[in-house]
């Protein structure tokens, strides 16, 4: 099982209190469920994406960013200097559900171009 957390589940950002709190809860639920079900042979992990090039980046905000503002965000705050593409997150999910990840459970895997490594 792979849950969807966010880097904002581990770090705070102004104006998105409920989002940060809910993603933090996803991270803790993932860890608790992993321990509860490890004896059942069920692996439970989560991905924690950073900024992903989807409509969500500009929806649900009082003042949605423009394309130019998103480009500036990527170049000024993300170490790899670009937004993630949805396929890049999907690739990590595919790995986590594969046999190659058979010894991984309870992990929160950041997919954030190095954002949380700073």
Can you say where each PLM-predicted feature lies in the sequence?
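Short, flexible catalytic-loop segment of classical short-chain dehydrogenase/reductase
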Residues: 27, 49-59
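Conserved SDR Rossmann-fold cofactor-binding beta-strand/turn motif
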Residues: 43-49, 53, 97, 110-112
